[in-house]
Curated annotation (Swiss-Prot):
Entry GO MF terms: S-adenosylmethionine-dependent methyltransferase activity
Protein name: Uncharacterized methyltransferase Aflv_0758
E.C. numbers: 2.1.1.-
List of residues binding S-adenosyl-L-methionine: G53, E74, D96
Source organism of the structure: Anoxybacillus flavithermus (strain DSM 21510 / WK1)
Family: Belongs to the methyltransferase superfamily. YrrT family.
Entry-linked SUPFAM superfamilies: S-adenosyl-L-methionine-dependent methyltransferases
PANTHER family associated with the record: TRANS-ACONITATE 2-METHYLTRANSFERASE-RELATED
GO term, biological process aspect, one: methylation
Function: Could be a S-adenosyl-L-methionine-dependent methyltransferase.
InterPro entries: Methyltransf_25 (IPR041698), SAM-dependent_MTases_sf (IPR029063), Uncharacterised_MeTfrase_YrrT (IPR023553)
Alphabetic keyword roster: Methyltransferase, S-adenosyl-L-methionine, Transferase
Length: 212
């Protein structure tokens, strides 16, 4: 359920914002257009939003500024503390993509950025199936995350990272569960969603799935 990576991200908590805003050369392409990616997720979201992987609260802040009601889920205690320091009074609960407390009101959108790859493909499909039962017709899943058009593209990106000496990025790509667009499309359509995929940079795709 992605919690096996908690130690890594708790160590990254203090420097995460520095990385996403381009100060870590290895991850510069991963976070290229970061503000645009977050803003696009906000634009495509409804009024009551369940957010997975709040992290330091960058997306959450934008959702709140857009007058959305946000219920955040974040498994890392240090990340939750950083987000609360940044945002003030906001609901951020301990949980993950598969095990989480439900909000006390219906929500129309589930969002996440840079986090769904913490799940294996089997767990991703389990999560999407669960969200299908929770969303009403017309409800949305709006995710932005690293994925690849096929396995060859994935392998090529690992080779490129190694060639550039980007050891951390290469290890990241091999350690976590980065999947392909065809695999994600199958998961969403199997569970009653229509889905579109839009490339946002060399790594990240925007996924907008609508419950039918």
């Amino acid at each position: 359920m992605g919690r096996e990576f908690l130690d890594i991200f708790e160590n990254w908590a203090q420097s995460y914002d520095s990385s996403v805003y381009g100060h870590d050369e290895q991850y510069r392409d991963v976070f290229d257009g970061y503000e645009t990616i977050l803003n696009t997720v906000v634009e495509k979201s409804g009024n009551v939003v369940l957010e997975f992987g709040v992290g330091t609260g960058n997306l959450t802040k934008k959702l709140i500024e857009a007058n959305k009601t946000v219920y955040g889920i974040e498994p890392s205690a240090p990340m939750r503390e950083l987000a609360k320091e940044k945002l003030g009074h906001v609901t951020i609960e301990d949980g993950d993509f598969l095990q989480f407390p439900l909000p006390n009101e219906p929500f129309d959108t589930i969002v996440s950025t840079y986090a769904f790859h913490h799940l294996t493909d089997q767990e991703k499909e389990e999560a999407i199936g669960k969200y299908s039962t929770l969303l009403r017709k017309g409800g949305k899943i709006v995710f932005a995350d690293t994925a690849f058009i096929n396995r060859e593209a994935y392998e090529a990106m690992i080779a490129e990272a190694k060639q550039k000496g980007f050891v951390d990025l290469a290890e990241d790509l091999q350690r976590e569960y980065y999947t392909t667009i065809p695999a994600l499309e199958h998961m969403f359509t199997t569970h009653g969603f229509t889905v579109t995929f839009t490339p946002m940079n060399r790594f990240v795709w925007l996924m907008e799935a609508v419950k039918q």
